[in-house]
Structure formats: structure tokens, C-alpha cells
């Protein structure tokens, strides 16, 4: 109670100092105060009540100012709510305020400091169910606010259950990639700023012993990748998880794509069945539905069924409104020249460029930096510390160029990305959606996306259109594309390390192209290898070991493992893959 008067008096003094520069409407009353104060100083000793009257007058004026300020703020808030109501919710936001959720004060305070006011569609439709302890399966576009949708109820559950470190882990969040796990942990850290509960993350690439020590001390909210979580469940004796209350699975479709299904089955067997389960996925496929059945398994006496929330089923576009999308048709031989010209012009912007292989990312990063176009790179062959540092540096940067593989295509919230360039086309439409989802995120988010296509790949646009993705053709001015081919060939030919890197990138590009699931479009035998070699700065195709038969066999084994031998089932009528036999809808959505 003691600090309150001190704060009040200090605010009074500061306001008195600011009075001489107050706005005109208040200057009249201010001059009256000053003249009254001067007159009071000249009064006789018999008029001792004047100072008290002056203090009372000041207090009345302060109260009037506060009331006016409060009324002004209330009117502004009402106006904003009215505008929201007239618009029916702008973009992904609704008219529902976070202050209406009724969460605990520590959580509410953290949300205010994170400057969140209105809930998104997925948050408004899922958080109330989750706060009531329901199981939820959610589907929403990337960048729609799914992370807050599952973290806020989870933190509230820990708070009301009075979880302490000695109680062990109460919430587990499973993420498909290390970067997404770290990012989710950082969001949870902000939300739990005023809570007493503990949190941590365990991911591949980090020291296992340090993680085991952390788990033994008690981690109430744990973010993990599947492989490392299963490792600790099997081998870490000090890991207390018998009181687990909630399991959250983020980006379930990506988990399945990365063949984590068997790991997840083993995780389900070890975790308590009497728990709340939350599953979020950007796309809904038959495989995700089957996986959901395993995820929501309960004890026999449990009769509750999960609540299904799909917020974009009626949308006419599979991508967000603020995204401008285009494609350009370029021969293999000129692909890099066009990319170079584009990036040179956009060096003051924030750009992400997607490639099909780690070696291709590595080579192009080395070459572009050699050509004085500064860029960073992220791919799966890097050590975790390098990936993490690069990722957070790019997040903080106002401008920059990041070259990456699909490791950066899902879930990551990178602020203010201006351009997404898909130098190598994605494997299928849903991968396209997730790549472009790195830009135009959140309410009123804006960004641009550019897809490079070879002339024989134009049929891919039919599949994109079937997936509710419309692109505009862009034509590059040939006069603005520099004629550097011979110069680039000399650079790569004379630099041993660049030459070796280029050979590996060339080989990986061909193998990645051969592994495309949509072989009616991406047929490796239709490639002009001399032109492909030119895009990697070779005059003639280099001598590299390319065993396409082995690569094809590996791809067939992968398909048998992923889809029970039925292959992908992708077609123009069903760009998301095979559906169940009784499913008559074009898209398997909830």
C-alpha cells in the first residue's frame, strides 16, 4: 500500500510542470490557477484558508481531467468496436476482445504487454472450448494465430491446477521442427512472464544431458520435437510426466510428412490417456484424420468427443488476402541470372528464397555472397546452433535475404517478410501454401510471392488453381537481366571450393527433381542438362555420380511407407492427395 501515495504525488508534480505547455482549452483554467496562486501569496496572514482552497481546486481539476481522459478512451474503444462490427471482422480478426476471455490476471497482463487486443477466427472458436477442458482438432491457414490459441488455455490450466516444479510436466507441445519448437517456447515464455510455473524445450541437436537435468528439476510446460521427446520418455529416469494434463500437437500434417508417425504412436503409448488433447494442422487430409483418431484415444470410460474447428472451409482462396502472387516462366539457362537481378534490386527488402536441396542452398549462398549480395542460409545439414542463430538474426533484421529449404517453410513466424521467392517449385500445392505463408502474416499483413517455372512445368498452375490458388504471370524485362554468364562460369571454374559446391548442388538438384511426386509435371527426363548446368555456372554438364534408379527406388519405398502403398493420389481434382472411399468432398476439410 505504501508505494501508491508516492506514485500519485509524483504524477501530480509531473503534471504541474507540464501545465505551461498544455493545450489552449486548458490554458485558461491554468492561468486562473497561476493568478490565484500569486494573489494568495500576497494575502494577509488572516486568510490562511487560501492554500487549502487551492489544493482542493487542483484536485478537482485533476479529477475532471482524468474523467475526460477516461471518457475519451471509452469513446475511442466503442468506435473501434463499432467499426469492427460494421465490417464483420476485418481479415482474420473477430470482434471478440482478449479482455473478454476471463483469463487469470498474470495471463491477461502478459497479453496486454504483447499488444494483442482482438482474437483471430481460430482463437475465438477454439480457446473457449479449450478453457472448458474439451479436446479440439483445429484447421486454419498458416499465420492465423494457432500458437496463442493453444498456449493460452494450456497456461491457464497449469495456473489453476497450481502446478509446481515438483509436480513435473503438465503440458507437452510437440512441434515438427526445431525452429518451430524454439519459437513456440519463446511465445510461451512471454505469456508466462508473470506466472510461477516453469517451462523449457527439448530438441535434437542440443545437449541431451543438460535437457535431462532440466527435466529432473521439473518443467511444467514442455515444448519438444518428436524424436527427442520419445528419447527422454524412454531413457530419462528423472522425467516426471505421470500427471500430464494436456498434449498439444502442432502442425500435425508436417509431422506425418516427416515420417514421425511411428514416434508419435510410441509417445501416445507412454503418456497418460486421461488427458486433454489438442491437434492443429494447416491442411486436413485422410492421413491426418487417421492420425487424429490415435491422438484422441481415451480411457474406456471416457465418452467425450473432440470438437472440430475449421475456420477457412468457406474461403475462396487458400492463401491470405494481403498476399500478391505471381509466377514467371524462365528457361533453365537463365534462371540464376534472373534471380541475381531480382535479389540485387531487392537488397533493401526482407526476402526468403526457397530451394529444393541443402547443397543448392549452400552453393547459392556462397556464390551470392561472393558477388557482393549479402545473404544468409538455413538448411537441414547445418548444426542446430548455426540454424538457430541465423533464424533469430533474420527475424530481428529489418532487411536481408535468407536462402532456405522447406525446413523454414512451416509454422515459423518471421516478422515483416516482403517477398517469398520459390526458385525451385514445391512438391505439391500444400507445400506452396506453407512457403508463401511466411509473408503477409497476421491482420492486414501484406507481402508478395514469386514462383519460378520452366516452360514444361506450366501444368502445375492447374493444380494450384484447383487448390484455390490464383497466380498472375510476370514478365521480366530482358534488358534488365545482366549478361554475366561467361563471367560466372569463369568465377566457378577458377575457384576450387565454389566449383565443388556447384557440382554438389547440380547433382542434388537433379536428384530432388527426380524425387518429385507429381512426375507428370516434373519429369527429370524432360530437363535439358546443358541448360541446367548453365544455371549452376557451368559451360557443360559436370561429371557427377547421378544414380536416378536408386533415387527412384528410394522414392517408391517412401511412398509405400507414407501411404500404405497407394501413392500420393494427387490430381487436379484433388490437389491435397488421396481421400477415404466414402469421402465425396473435393477437399477433406473440417
From Swiss-Prot:
One of its GO terms (molecular function) is RNA helicase activity. It catalyses: ATP + H2O = ADP + phosphate + H(+). Residues 1-92, 551-590 are annotated as: Disordered. Residues 27-62 have a biased composition (Acidic residues). Residues 335-488 form the Helicase C-terminal domain. A motif (Q motif) lies at residues 96-124. Residues 127-302 form the Helicase ATP-binding domain. One of its GO terms (biological process) is maturation of LSU-rRNA from tricistronic rRNA transcript (SSU-rRNA, 5.8S rRNA, LSU-rRNA). A motif (DEAD box) lies at residues 250-253. Its EC number is 3.6.4.13. SMART domains: DEXDc (SM00487), DUF4217 (SM01178), HELICc (SM00490). Pfam families: CTE_SPB4, DEAD, Helicase_C. ATP binds at residues 140-147. Residues 63-76, 579-590 have a biased composition (Basic and acidic residues). GO terms for cellular component: nucleolus. Keywords: ATP-binding, Coiled coil, Helicase, Hydrolase, Nucleotide-binding, RNA-binding. SUPFAM superfamilies: P-loop containing nucleoside triphosphate hydrolases. Residues 40-87 form a coiled coil. InterPro entries: DDX18/Has1_DEADc, DEAD/DEAH_box_helicase_dom, Helicase_ATP-bd, Helicase_C-like, P-loop_NTPase, RNA-helicase_DEAD-box_CS, RNA_helicase_DEAD_Q_motif, SPB4-like_CTE. The Q motif is unique to and characteristic of the DEAD box family of RNA helicases and controls ATP binding and hydrolysis. Belongs to the DEAD box helicase family. DDX18/HAS1 subfamily. This is DEAD-box ATP-dependent RNA helicase 27.
Amino acid at each position: 500500500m505504501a508505494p501508491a501515495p508516492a506514485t500519485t504525488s509524483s504524477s501530480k508534480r509531473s503534471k504541474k510542470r507540464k501545465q505551461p505547455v498544455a493545450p489552449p482549452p486548458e490554458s485558461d483554467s491554468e492561468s486562473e490557477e497561476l493568478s490565484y496562486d500569486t494573489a494568495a501569496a500576497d494575502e494577509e496572514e488572516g486568510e490562511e484558508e487560501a492554500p487549502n482552497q487551492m489544493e482542493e481546486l487542483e484536485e478537482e481539476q485533476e479529477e475532471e481531467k482524468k474523467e475526460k481522459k477516461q471518457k475519451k478512451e471509452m469513446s475511442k474503444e466503442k468506435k473501434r468496436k463499432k467499426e469492427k462490427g460494421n465490417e464483420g471482422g476485418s481479415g482474420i480478426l473477430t470482434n471478440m476482445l482478449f479482455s473478454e476471455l476471463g483469463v487469470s490476471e498474470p495471463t491477461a497482463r502478459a497479453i496486454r504487454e504483447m499488444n494483442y487486443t482482438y482474437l483471430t477466427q481460430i482463437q475465438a472458436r477454439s480457446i473457449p472450448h479449450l478453457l472448458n477442458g474439451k479436446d479440439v482438432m483445429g484447421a486454419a491457414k498458416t499465420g492465423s494465430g494457432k500458437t496463442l490459441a493453444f498456449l493460452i488455455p494450456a497456461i491457464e490450466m497449469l495456473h489453476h491446477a497450481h502446478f509446481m516444479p515438483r509436480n513435473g510436466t503438465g503440458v507437452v507441445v510437440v512441434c515438427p521442427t526445431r525452429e518451430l519448437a524454439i519459437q513456440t517456447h519463446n511465445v510461451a515464455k512471454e505469456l508466462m512472464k508473470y506466472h510461477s510455473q516453469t517451462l523449457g524445450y527439448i530438441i535434437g541437436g542440443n545437449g541431451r544431458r543438460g535437457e535431462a537435468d532440466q527435466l529432473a528439476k521439473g518443467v511444467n510446460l514442455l515444448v519438444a520435437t518428436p524424436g527427442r521427446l520419445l528419447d527422454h520418455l524412454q531413457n530419462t529416469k528423472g522425467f516426471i510426466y505421470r500427471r500430464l494434463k494436456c498434449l498439444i500437437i502442432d502442425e500435425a500434417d508436417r509431422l506425418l510428412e516427416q515420417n514421425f508417425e511411428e514416434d508419435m504412436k510410441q509417445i501416445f503409448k507412454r503418456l497418460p490417456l486421461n488427458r486433454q488433447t489438442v491437434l492443429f494442422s494447416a491442411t486436413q487430409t485422410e492421413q491426418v484424420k487417421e492420425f487424429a483418431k490415435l491422438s484422441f484415444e481415451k480411457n474406456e470410460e471416457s465418452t467425450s468427443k473432440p470438437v472440430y474447428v475449421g475456420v477457412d472451409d468457406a474461403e475462396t482462396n487458400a492463401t491470405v488476402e494481403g498476399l500478391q502472387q505471381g509466377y514467371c516462366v524462365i528457361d533453365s539457362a537463365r534462371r540464376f541470372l534472373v534471380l541475381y537481378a531480382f535479389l540485387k534490386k531487392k537488397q533493401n527488402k526482407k526476402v526468403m528464397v526457397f530451394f529444393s536441396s541443402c547443397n543448392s542452398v549452400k552453393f547459392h549462398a556462397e556464390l551470392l555472397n561472393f558477388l557482393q549480395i549479402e545473404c544468409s542460409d538455413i538448411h537441414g545439414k547445418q548444426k542446430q546452433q548455426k540454424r538457430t542463430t541465423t533464424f533469430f538474426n533474420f527475424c530481428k533484421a529489418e532487411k536481408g535475404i535468407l536462402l532456405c529449404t522447406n525446413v523454414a517453410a512451416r509454422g515459423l513466424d518471421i516478422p515483416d517478410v516482403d517477398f517469398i521467392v520459390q526458385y525451385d517449385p514445391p512438391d505439391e500445392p500444400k507445400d506452396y501454401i506453407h512457403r508463401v505463408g511466411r509473408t503477409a502474416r497476421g491482420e492486414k499483413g501484406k507481402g508478395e510471392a514469386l514462383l519460378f517455372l520452366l516452360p514444361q512445368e506450366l501444368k502445375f498452375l492447374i493444380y494450384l488453381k484447383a487448390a484455390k490458388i490464383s497466380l498472375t504471370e510476370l514478365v521480366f524485362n530482358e534488358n534488365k537481366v545482366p549478361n554475366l554468364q561467361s563471367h560466372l562460369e569463369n568465377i566457378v571454374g577458377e575457384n576450387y571450393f565454389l566449383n565443388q559446391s556447384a557440382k554438389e548442388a547440380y547433382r542434388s538438384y537433379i536428384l530432388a527433381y527426380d524425387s518429385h511426386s507429381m512426375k507428370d509435371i516434373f519429369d527429370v527426363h524432360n530437363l535439358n542438362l546443358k541448360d541446367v548446368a548453365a544455371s549452376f555456372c557451368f559451360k557443360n554438364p559436370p561429371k557427377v555420380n547421378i544414380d536416378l534408379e536408386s533415387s527412384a527406388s528410394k522414392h517408391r519405398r517412401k511412398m509405400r511407407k507414407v501411404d500404405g502403398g497407394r501413392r500420393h493420389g494427387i490430381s487436379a481434382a484433388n490437389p491435397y492427395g488421396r481421400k477415404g472411399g466414402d469421402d465425396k468432398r473435393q477437399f477433406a476439410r473440417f
